[in-house]
Amino acid sequence: KYLGGSSANIAFGTARLGLKSAMLSRVGDDHMGRFLVESLAREGCDVSAIQVDPQRLTAMVLLGLKDRETFPLVFYRENCADMALSAEDINEAFIASSKALLITGTHFSTDGVYRASLQALDYAQKHGVKRVLDIDYRPVLWGLAGKADGETRFVADHQVSQHVQSILPRFDLIVGTEEEFLIAGGSADLLTALRTVRSLSAATLVVKLGPQGCTVIHGEIPPRLEDGAIYPGVRVEVLNVLGAGDAFMSGFLSGWLEDASDERCCQLANACGGLVVSRHACAPAMPTRAELDYLFSSPVPITRPDQDPVLQRLHQVSVPRKAWKQLFVFAFDHRGQLVELAQQGGQDPTRISALKQLFIQAVERVEQLLREQGVAADVGLLADQRFGQDALNAATGRGWWVARPVEVQGSRPLAFEHGRSVGSNLIAWPQEQIIKCLVQYHPDDEPLLRLEQEAQIRGLYQASQVSGHELLLEIIPPKDLPGAHPEVLYRSLKRLYNLGIYPAWWKIEAQSAEEWQ
């Protein structure tokens, strides 16, 4: 599942680009609502104005990916929390504290949220806050398509056009696709529609032209769009168009709110949209400034961002990660050793699971003790699936650092507990759990052994990139090969980095200060 909704995507995307964004909405008192709020907050978005509606559920949409042009959508938005936003929910001081207010077109489609939007616009005008409209026309959300037909992007309707036209004078910036300006202008001809919009609003108009890019119109509508500047799009292979418009808007705002030129605003917007359509997700696919800088500085066009290793790595490391304090981690992912102890004591190995649940209580006590002593620290654990599944379940969702092993204990060459297809096992893992893999590795291993080990590690790293889980590599030089331990460790890490393997965490033996240097 991904965070979604046009407004939420834009709040997420602008925050990722370094803007101070905030979301004003409602969510249900449910798991999905909490997921949305947590996702926005983790990205740096202000969520203080998001209210919890105990009477309604959080809206959802199901997305299908058939081919490069077919993306069926089913919206579940009847009587949902965000569409119950009321005028009383709009705080004048909150609006006044903003530099810009963005509203998407769907928020004018029903009476209640329409009044709430007008209230927000009134406050924005009163306090000199820039007002932005993303037309974001979805016929199904205006009752013009079948309930399951979320894919249809345009249905002409005179009443909808009149309704949209009534709010156009209130905005300073209006952004939409060609089809969205057709509905706003109430015409089947784009230039005629744009002239109607211009007769109602002096706003800057940004027309999205799909793969061709976009154009910006400040004053009179030209005889042809080509008579103005067409800012070209980024050529990429399309995987999923959903979220592209929200990424475009995020990029455009990141320039527009800093008074950048039209060319720069459109460069940012087109690049953000291009990167998102080349990836599977919507909000999580939104780029960072570091990704955009790399894209713009590339000497050759990057048409497959999803396959560019540098861009993939930047997308991993330049997005916000949880800021851990000093960590106190209890490692009890031992399997074979505990089985041996159980057998030596004449005990049934199945009791190991109960033992590991006791270890959870130990972690809880340490966490409580650290709080009582005022120590700024986080706690965590390493636990295995074989004997520690109940412990993993108990630890998940508590804000703890949680990692679990995937390697067959003692294997050399490296083998995984659930076979070579480690990625198929990761599907069932909670996103917060970290992949831990211990490898007995030496850069001077016999070539066939070293290559097999490196292939396994690379496959695991690639699987972690797809699944979104962080990877922890524990490198232990085998005892049967010579060499000073610090030097071997240094060469091992350097070799893996050179192979393009960048785990989020390393687990290595402590070194002296001199050895670290």
Listing of model-derived features with the role each one plays in the protein:
Residues 20-105, 293-302:
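Conserved N-terminal subdomain of the carbohydrate kinase-like
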